[in-house]
Structure formats: C-alpha cells, structure tokens
Curated annotation (Swiss-Prot):
Pathway: Purine metabolism; IMP biosynthesis via de novo pathway; 5-amino-1-(5-phospho-D-ribosyl)imidazole-4-carboxamide from 5-amino-1-(5-phospho-D-ribosyl)imidazole-4-carboxylate: step 1/2. InterPro entries: SAICAR_synt/ADE2_N, SAICAR_synt_PurC, SAICAR_synth, SAICAR_synthetase, SAICAR_synthetase_CS. This is Phosphoribosylaminoimidazole-succinocarboxamide synthase. The gene is purC. SUPFAM superfamilies: SAICAR synthase-like. Belongs to the SAICAR synthetase family. Its EC number is 6.3.2.6. It comes from Latilactobacillus sakei subsp. sakei (strain 23K).
Length: 241
C-alpha cells in the first residue's frame, strides 16, 4: 500500500492510501495542552484513545450517526473516509467547566439548564478563536443549512452519549466534535476520546479526561483505561467492524 503523510496533528496523523477516497488515521502517543504549546510523549496513549474512539464511533453508527470510520486496522490505525473537514470545532457543554467557567465567572460543576453549543475556528496560527455563526457563514466556512445539520447531529450525539456514560457511572460534562463533507452530506469525523471531552466520575467527581494531564493530577493512560474498561463492558460488542 502506497502511503504519504498528508497531515500531522497533535494526536493523530493522516496518510493517503491506494484508494483516493480512503485515508489511514494513526493515533499518536502524544499529549498536548495550551493549544499544542505543551507537548509530552506518553506511551500507550495512542492505543487507548484509539480503543475508546473505536467503541464510541461504532456505537454512534449503530444509533444512526454516520461517521468517517470504515475499518479498524491495528492497535492504533483506522481506515477512514476522506472527508473535507469543516474548519470549525463544535463544542457542546452540559455542565460549567473549563474556559466557560473562567470566562463567565460561573461555579464549576453547575449543570446548565440546556446544552450550550459553541464554535471555534480551526486555525492554529490564530489559536483557534471563538467564532459565531454569522462570522462563520460570512467567511464561507459553513453554510446555514450545514449549521442546522451540525447542531441537530451534535444534540443527537449528546443525548446518546449522556445516556451511555450515565450507565457506566460517568457524567458527560462537555465535548468537541468535528464534521466533514462527504459525497454531498455531513458526517462525523475526527475522534471521540477523553482528549476531546470532559468526563467526571459520578461517585468521586474526579476527572477521567485530559484535565488529568493539563492539571498534573495523575497518570493519563491509567485514567483513560478506566474509561475504556467501563465502555468495553457496556458496548464492547459494537466495535466488531
């Protein structure tokens, strides 16, 4: 198989394959914070992120959410559909945490009356600034129709994952999604792992996500493996793709 590196990100690399419509995605043993300014190699992180995202994407697919995942290849590699990524990070918040708490001076852990969706322009040179829909459409990053689809899919994913994580004793605090255009429709791309969501244990209220790395609160891989073990018991059968 002929492979060329097309993109090297903070947590994953993308390679071409012999099929122009298919890419290989490889999860890396790298943790980052401060929008990539702090980096650290952590053995085993790529594999555990791969395993968690594999389970979540398979589960969402079974629930009717189309994703870019085609096939799991190895312990850190997947074949995915070649999409045109919409350059927006879509953040949904169920509970006050992170930058939302700091920006608005709200108490950490306060449950929001309804989920809040925020958008950030995917541009490393600009440090991924917050952007509203009027700005995003004016810059032709996305169309109004696509925004409606993105918001509907994001809310549906939130409903599904709140229920799933609740069943394994975890609160879904917030998460980030990315979407791509594929054959005239929008599909879920990127990954879903503790790298791009906040998860709190319902009994201890401890972080089960990348805040462990950001705040130096413990061993990242051990924490991620806790999430993986609980998910595997609940939805391990969905991942046979």
């Amino acid at each position: 198989m002929s492979e060329t590196l097309l993109y090297s990100g903070k947590a994953k690399d993308l390679f071409s394959t012999d099929d122009p419509e298919v890419l290989k995605m490889i999860y890396k043993d790298q943790a980052t914070a401060l929008n990539g300014k702090r980096k650290e190699q952590i053995t085993g992180k790529g594999e555990v992120n791969y395993e968690i995202s594999k389970l979540i994407f398979a589960y969402l697919s079974q629930q009717g959410i189309e994703t870019h995942l085609i096939k799991n290849v190895s312990e850190t590699e997947q074949l995915v559909k070649k999409v045109t990524i919409i350059p927006l990070e879509v953040v949904l918040r169920n509970v006050v945490a992170g930058s939302f708490a700091r920006k608005f001076g709200q108490p950490l852990g306060q449950r929001l009356e309804q989920p809040i969706i925020e958008y950030y322009y995917k541009n490393d040179a600009l440090d991924d600034p917050a952007i509203n829909i009027s700005q995003a459409t004016a810059l032709k990053l996305v169309t109004p129709t696509e925004v409606a689809t993105i918001e509907a899919m994001t809310k549906q994913i939130n409903t599904l994952l709140i229920k799933l994580f609740n069943e394994i004793g975890i609160d879904l605090i917030d998460f980030k999604l990315e979407f791509g255009r594929y054959q005239g429709r929008l599909i879920l791309a990127d990954e879903f792992s503790p790298d791009n969501c906040r998860l709190w244990d319902q009994k201890t209220h401890s972080s089960l996500d990348k805040d462990v790395f950001r705040q130096n609160k413990g061993d990242l891989v051990t924490v991620y493996e806790t999430v993986l073990q609980r998910l595997t018991k609940m939805i391990g059968g969905f991942a046979n793709v």
